[in-house]
């Protein structure tokens, strides 16, 4: 995420110095080209929850999603460093198709839950079989943070990106309790 924000900041700064000749769409295209993927540069530039996918014509499709105002995100940032390359090393080269299907289904529940504020859909949608089983062991105390957040009222808790930050989703009224857990 930090490289993406640096790229976006550099592009916005350069564009401003040149009296903003490039529209946001072109800045987005440049940011994706520089970073190599849209995962972090898109929300860094557009803000909010963004979905990205490469289409059959090899162009990036970007969709900004609604996020119900009753749902808040709380992020715990541990005082450890974890490089993306280190986090990628623990990932298997292949995963069972059933795990991939499970994650795709969970994503549909999560997105609908975030849009509608449906707590049960968010809880069910925060289930992951592709990344977290391998990456939690890299974040010392991470599972304790997850348990504390859930016990404090979080609807779900996950590793943010490659880690080590941990994201909890909660109802607005539980945000303070979750953040103090």
Please name every model-derived segment.
Residues 54, 78, 168-172:
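Short beta-strand-to-loop capping motifs
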Residues 114-181:
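Glycine-rich, charge-dense phosphate/pyrophosphate-binding loop(s)
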